[in-house]
Amino acid sequence: MLRGAFIGFGNVAAKGHMPGWRARDDARIVAATDAAASRREAFLAACPDGRWRDSVDDLLFGETLDFVDICAPPGSHAALIERALCAGLHVLSEKPLVTTVEDAKRVAAAAARARRVLHAVHNWLEAPICRKISALIDEGAIGTVRSVRWRTLRTQPAIAVSAEGVTNWRVDPAMAGGGILFDHGWHALYCVMRWAGVPVGAAARLETRRFHEQPLEDTATLDLDTAAGTSNIFLTWAADERSNAIEIEGEDGEIRVVGDALILKSNAREGRWCCPPSLSQGSHHADWFGGVAADFVAAATRNARSNLDEAVLCARLIDAAQRSSAAGGVRVTLAG
């Protein structure tokens, strides 16, 4: 039985992760800490047998642990990951894993030195509709994927639980790392990579269309070049509706996602599946966490592969997108 603890116990931890940990018989949460002391009551209500620790050091060195589940704001991830790895613990971290390429390289090296698992929460791949997409692509239903067209529309940034006196960290550059590119773009990137392959280049434009009082972009447009074609991602917090749409073109057919419906049209067959919930329904996705936890535990106990390489590539692609946008949208090649 693995013993774990939360670093950060906001809504994502309480509503998105905790139900999944409670459902497992091979791992359990025994403690937590958060910069907001007010989260103590919420944690103890969710985990009556758990212990609340007043600091990260108190947690790391005052508990007997096998892993930590980091659900703190992204700007703190790199330092927290390194501290946990240095303490000999496996680490599961919410996305984005880190906020810079340099930090991505550093935590990957730290995991290798510590010989511990570092795994990112790439939970959208566990959504029923995304699992169905992956299965259809893997069985060759549309042949080689040429392009993915991804749309995420939101009307505003999500509100995050913060320490007293701290504003919403999602729109704080120091804590979020970036605007919607980090918040929703990270999900889009690992999904597109899973279906279309690893990009070799990227071009992007980051804009502020509505929330001009905030220092981060509320809209992002990315083109990703792969060996078979070019995929496009559009993300905005400045829409008039909340929705997601996906269109995937293959050499032998296409897959479309509208709401919770998946539609397949190919040379060999056609099909339609209802795969609730839709990607735009809810925010914490507790039902998508089970597969993430299973993969993490398998990596920690049975030497299964973690998704660290995928997470590092997400960081590299976001860096390329930021550099592209700063240069007017020029294409940036990913080396190596």
Predicted features by range, described:
Residues 12, 280-294:
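Active-site loop of classical SDR/Rossmann-like NAD(P)-dependent oxidoreductases
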Residues 1-47:
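N-terminal Rossmann-like dinucleotide-binding module
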Residues 125-205, 210-212:
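Predominantly a Rossmann-like dinucleotide-binding segment in NAD(P)-dependent oxidoreductases
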Residues 106-124, 144-147:
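Rossmann-fold dehydrogenase core element
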Residues 27, 67-72, 105, 116, ...:
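C-terminal helix-rich "cap/oligomerization" subdomain common to oxidoreductases
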Residues 189-261, 290-304, 320, 336:
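Contiguous beta-strand/loop segments that form the cofactor/metal-binding neighborhood of enzyme cores
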Residues 54, 93, 118-120, 257:
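Hydrophobic residues in well-ordered beta-strands that form the structural core
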Residues 50-110:
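Beta-loop-alpha module in the N-terminal Rossmann-like domain of NAD(P)-dependent dehydrogenases
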